[in-house]
């Protein structure tokens, strides 16, 4: 009897439903880091620089680049044969001469500060007043400017280049199929092609490319301050500027006799409108503004906040923004790209320097 009861208890116990097995807890979802969130936000407004700025009307070729580099450094394109593109836009000095305004023909001073040539091809227009659409058109200006390189005419420039025997073959290779490739337009196209690869990737580009350690926490704090203060309302795009015009003195008037874009359009609305400069390499490209009137970066940051945004920044905010801006300092990927080339020798008919 006892054995039967035990067997009954065993069988009935086995017939009870088993305890349900609880599913395994899903692994915790990793939350993005603060740096990753910052990368996501910043890259949407200020993406990394591309390797070049193409122009469908002027395809970049090795032959154009080689020729353009030579022309960029050739002082024979100036009246006194002392000045070249590189005289004011020095490639071994972040593309500037660090002067308020540049020294041109016969020691004359230009009316505006010479902006850096680096990354300029990404800008929507050229010059402070936007009078040139692209770097090809821009390259035509200084050569004929009486205050700058002072050549008397396009024809005179072409004649100089044609008088240098070594250029004939270089132009033929750069512009194949053209019966007369040495033209003023082609001189500008070659220089423009060379400039379209004058790009300076920096630590910031590594950061928005996904490297959270590329810039320090202090510099990331500066980026946040840059965003919160409103600097990005004008300094936008991969070049942190160069994409729009803005009035100098939006909130607080700025004293200047230069009317900016008004000189080009004669439109009253364009008075005091200037192209917003790029902040790439800004640590190295002072003095600042169209007239080079501001000597140092912290002062420039503070003044822009006051006059453009109506904000009085604390010293800490200025320091934070300055720290971030230094992450935009870069250099060409290939230093050989900016090295001065050996120029073709003058011919028997090449004009002599004219100091007048």
Residue map of PLM features:
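Periplasmic c-type cytochrome electron-transfer domains
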Residues: 14-356
